[in-house]
């Protein structure tokens, strides 16, 4: 018992010589090696308790929000109780943002980077309806292939004949028009004239 652990001796020596130990406390006030008791460092223990409490409250809030989100978007159910297969998906960004198919967005929902209503009137909206295959006695998995059905072109006459092509999502018609404009005398855009 005469031989004490050198690390414990160093900790006790440091603790005794520190300013916190000038009150006459001894090494028995340590909970473990290097961890002060509540009476020595009550401020640190209060801070640790507050941080732990905030962490637990945050964890509970996130878990409740996550479970609420999962119950709303139950797999196989749409917004109004319909199955996912009955709700068509559109590749048009404006439709995804507003839920409406109108050409002119409301003034409070306009994106200032798009150029306002003048550009919105010039754009050609081209979107596609993606329909999933109906389940045959089972819930479709994440690897179920998507059947591409129809492509609908909703266009208005443009004031400018040659302008930049609008940004379209899921658009086949715009690529076809570009290919015809680039190679009017060739059957395909990527075909090259034969070398003679």
Curated annotation (Swiss-Prot):
Residues 169-172 are annotated as: Interaction with CSK. Residues 146-151 are annotated as: Interaction with PTPN11. Residues 25-40 are extracellular. It comes from Homo sapiens. InterPro entries: Sit1 (IPR033269). It is a single-pass type I membrane protein. The modification Phosphotyrosine is found at residues 90, 127, 148, 169, 188. This is Signaling threshold-regulating transmembrane adapter 1. GO terms for biological process: adaptive immune response; regulation of T cell activation; signal transduction; T cell homeostasis. Residues 90-93, 188-191 are annotated as: Interaction with GRB2. Residues 132-167 are annotated as: Disordered.
